[in-house]
Amino acid sequence: MKIGVLFTIISMLCLLEVRKICSKKEGGYPRYFSFGYKCQNWGTNEYCRTVCQLHKGEYGYCYAGDCYCEGLTEENRLFWNVYRKYCKNPLFD
């Protein structure tokens, strides 16, 4: 009985730790207005890398016809959020 409870507790702690480690890296599809950045060359390509650099992501590639960025945060997902945050423009100051 004690071994079963101990095993259950250890298993749950391991699962929580794995979820925490795996969920650290954010990512997603950057958006230009409400549309994604379309691409045709699946895999790594210069266009998606440039798009991800624009959105302050770490690395980009084409997946399922849209550019996908590793390390993309929620606040930098939309183009206008990035523009307002990083570009100097007297209209937004």
From Swiss-Prot:
One of its GO terms (molecular function) is sodium channel inhibitor activity. It holds the Pfam family Toxin_3. Expressed by the venom gland. It is found in: Secreted. Residues 26-88 form the LCN-type CS-alpha/beta domain. One of its GO terms (cellular component) is extracellular region. The keyword Iron does not apply. Keywords: Disulfide bond, Ion channel impairing toxin, Neurotoxin, Secreted, Signal, Toxin, Voltage-gated sodium channel impairing toxin. Disulfide bonds join C22-C87, C39-C62, C48-C67, C52-C69. The keyword Nucleus does not apply. Its main location: secreted. Transmembrane segments: none annotated. CDD domains: neurotoxins_LC_scorpion (cd23106). InterPro entries: LCN-type_CS_alpha_beta_dom, Scorpion_toxin-like_sf, Scorpion_toxinL/defensin. Residues 1-23 form the signal peptide. The edited BmKBTx-like may modulate voltage-gated sodium channels (Nav). Belongs to the long (4 C-C) scorpion toxin superfamily. Has the structural arrangement of an alpha-helix connected to antiparallel beta-sheets by disulfide bonds (CS-alpha/beta). This is Putative sodium channel toxin Ts41. It comes from Tityus serrulatus.
